[in-house]
Amino acid sequence: MSHSNPPTGASGGPGSASASAAPARGYYSLKRSIQTAFNDPLDRGLGPPAYQSKVRVMDKYQVIGFISSGTYGRVYKARGRQGQPGEFAIKKFKPDKEGEQITYTGISQSAIREMALCSELRHPNVIRLVETILEDKAIFMVFEYAEHDLLQIIHHHTQQPKHPIPPQTIKSIMFQLLNGCQYLHTNWVLHRDLKPANIMVTSSGEVKVGDLGLARIFWKPVRTLMQGDKVVVTIWYRAPELLMGSHHYTPAVDMWAVGCIFAELLSLRPIFKGEEAKMDNTKKGGSRDMPFQRHQMQKIVDIMGMPTKERWPLLTSMPDYDKLPLLQPPLSASGYSQQPAHSHHHHQHYNQGPQYGGRAGGPTSSSSANSSSAAAAASQSHLDKWYYHTVSQGQTAGPMPHAPPGSLASLGVEGYKLLAGLLEYDPEKRLTAAAALQHNFFSTGDRVSANCFEGCKAEYPHRRVSQEDNDIRTGSVPGTKRSGMPDDSMGRPGKRVKE
């Protein structure tokens, strides 16, 4: 996918009125510190609408409790004061030290990016930034509050007695999620960390894409996207082109993650649950090599089949193409049926021909034919078997002509086609958000509701809020997660392996 046109609505270029209105002030601003810039009354009314100068958090918001913590800070639930109704999530970015004298050295690149993007984005299916406040050298981002997230909803359905998410709920969630993604991509924004924990759901059933800490503008980047952030997207939702070491990528990486989320809504567990290999930090000079994520790629191959240059023409240009022989051929399709799985070949390394990076040639024409046959079998996708086995609750590995109304099987063949379009190996062929929204999946069967809870009998628990640690001003900032809104409090994914 290539993009050569500038973002729609771009303004303020060198020849614009806004660019030439106040040259003196622009020169002055270069000399100011960040602290002075925040407090300077000249900034009032000139920045984004969400910006506030000299406002104290506790004057505007009553903190109800602590939600979660992350690398960059903590998230609190709050209620509005001064005639500002409603509940809010306040994300506090920690200063360099707390409880001691603070040396202000600046703001992290991730925080700046998140503040800049969120202040510009306005869409019903993207979490809304209400305002940003600087107080005592700490930054507070005030977001609209969402009572649920998809991880919490999925977890609720895994509790005994285990019960599937209603199909009309899944359809509404997917439509709203794709709507939010289309808005981001239309505005040249890659999310780069879509997963159930980052998809918020309000009490009224509105689905909102949240946590833009890894988001990035992808229109004409100065450097390859990988140079800025080597590791993007949580491992279970990471697209094949990222796993194969691609240095540049497109919104298709978000769409693969959306496909993984769709599959997880159906099965209540991650479809590709691999383990992440750690970076090698032992190299001289402090360089850090990105390891080939063999285990995660194997999980994809087990269901999707081995990638080939016929299915994915640019496969041979991937940096880790030569690592494909390390992978094993997938289990046979019988693994998704009622018959025993025949997996006697599953523990042999796959090295059957040059199209997979193997050695070309063979001793006889017979062995060559066998090799071609094995390659064809290894590249066959079993996603259809996985889908029908999942939606039929294990009853069949094929379509059900007369699926009971209200059952997952009622999502039918169009559900499979949408899933297959999102989980396409080739990012050029993968469905875009705009194309997915036009898919027959949303125009057949029950109408798509703007409230994903409409007709749903499940009562989902409220978000956990701690009353013991709700001092937004002086609390310490523990935690090791990259982002604090919200953190993945259900403990996933955590296991790593050293390659």
From Swiss-Prot:
Keywords of the record: Activator, ATP-binding, Kinase, Magnesium, Metal-binding, Nucleotide-binding, Nucleus, Repressor, Serine/threonine-protein kinase, Transcription, Transcription regulation, Transferase
Catalytic residues of the enzyme: 193
Alphabetized InterPro entries for the sequence: CDK (IPR050108), Kinase-like_dom_sf (IPR011009), Prot_kinase_dom (IPR000719), Ser/Thr_kinase_AS (IPR008271)
Superkingdom of the source species: Eukaryota
Keyword Signal: no
Keyword ATP-binding: yes
EC number: 2.7.11.22, 2.7.11.23
UniProt cross-references to PROSITE patterns, sorted A to Z: PROTEIN_KINASE_DOM (PS50011), PROTEIN_KINASE_ST (PS00108)
Region (Disordered) residue spans: 1-21, 332-376, 463-499
Low complexity compositional bias, start-end: 365-376
Cofactor(s) listed in the protein's UniProt record: Mg(2+)
Biased composition (Basic and acidic residues): 463-472
Cellular component terms (Gene Ontology): CKM complex; mediator complex
Protein purpose: Component of the SRB8-11 complex. The SRB8-11 complex is a regulatory module of the Mediator complex which is itself involved in regulation of basal and activated RNA polymerase II-dependent transcription. The SRB8-11 complex may be involved in the transcriptional repression of a subset of genes regulated by Mediator. It may inhibit the association of the Mediator complex with RNA polymerase II to form the holoenzyme complex. The SRB8-11 complex phosphorylates the C-terminal domain (CTD) of the largest subunit of RNA polymerase II.
Family classification: Belongs to the protein kinase superfamily. CMGC Ser/Thr protein kinase family. CDC2/CDKX subfamily.
Name of this protein: Serine/threonine-protein kinase SSN3
Taxonomic source organism: Pyricularia oryzae (strain 70-15 / ATCC MYA-4617 / FGSC 8958)
Highest classification ranks of the organism: Eukaryota, Fungi, Dikarya, Ascomycota, Pezizomycotina
Encoding gene per record: SSN3
